[in-house]
Amino acid sequence: MKIAKILAAAALCLSVCSAAFAAPAVKTFDVHEGSVKIDVPQIKGAAGGKFADNKINNTLNFYVLKQLYTALPLSMRNDDVMRTAYNKTFKAKDGSEDAREFVEDVAGFVNFKLRCDLEDVKQYGGTSVSSYDLQGQYNVHFKGDNYLSVEQRGYIYTGGAHGMTLFNAATFDLNTGREVELADLFKNGSNYLERINKVVAAKIAEDSRMFFGPVEVKDGDRFYIQDGKNLVIAYPPYEVAPYAAGVVTFAIPLDGLSDILAVDIK
């Protein structure tokens, strides 16, 4: 009888421990307002609890807001001002819920503006285009116990030969909810940029004609973790290559950087 109780207690302990360290769930929050259709990732169950969930979701919502603002005049698109105002407004414990409502409101306004812009072109310039639109999707590249990597892509079309591809990648610490910078992954004083750039240079040498010139990876460049195996440095169209090249990515095996990694990516 005692053995049965011990085994039951052990099983319960294992189930609780597994739940405590399980990767978070990622669900889709749909923003569909007429010609604006964006799928927004929202997480629940980060290791850092609701505080981390809220912080991560707030950041993901902000990046969607940036996509929406591409449809607005340049005078309304100062990233630093936007982020400061956004963080001040939605920094509360449950601010991500209010932020989602705000994103929906902005999407409604953007949809209205796109419709008005198209009608103006039809009236004064003429066009065979049936709609202007803004679409967005996301892809979870890595969801582990400690880190989450998400890519958010969008596409806005407002006439012309082609639209504009929108791209962002972000990696989060699931314990704190903080967005991770490239430097955070490596030991202090390590030559991580030199090592990464060596791999990138070798890949470019295989087909240098598609690039504008040499590519130098810097702190602040976009990146994501792919399946816990690769560090992927990513650049939107026009940043390092022509539009036709799409989003340019360089996959660097983490095994080759294991001696200078400061974190356990799992």
Task: Report the location of each language-model feature.
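Sec-dependent N-terminal signal peptides of Gram-positive bacterial secreted proteins and lipoproteins
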Residues: 2-22
